[in-house]
C-alpha cells in the first residue's frame, strides 16, 4: 500500500498511522513490520489492538518503534494518546499529503475522526 502511495504522490508526504492487530501477529511478523514502512515519511504507532490476547513481552508498539528505527526509519513515533495523535497529524499534514491508517480494531474510528477534523480545518483556512 505504501509503495503504491509513493507512486501516486511522489512530491508530498506520506503519513502512516499503524495499529498492530494482536500481539502474536506482531511477534510473528515483527521483522516484516520493521521493514515495510520505508515508503512512509512519518510513521505513528498506536497501542496494539489485542483482540483478547494477553501482551507478549518485547512485542509492544514501543518495541516496534525501536525496530523501525533500527531498520533506518527516521520519523517513527509511538503515540499512546489519541488526542495527541490528532493534534500532531493536524499540525503535520499539508494539502495533498497522504494519510494512510493501517491495522484492525479501533483504527477505523480514528480514521473517521481524522477525516472529519481535517475537513473542518480545511474549511476554516
Which positions does each model-derived feature cover?
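ATP-dependent carboxylate-amine ligase
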Residues: 1-125
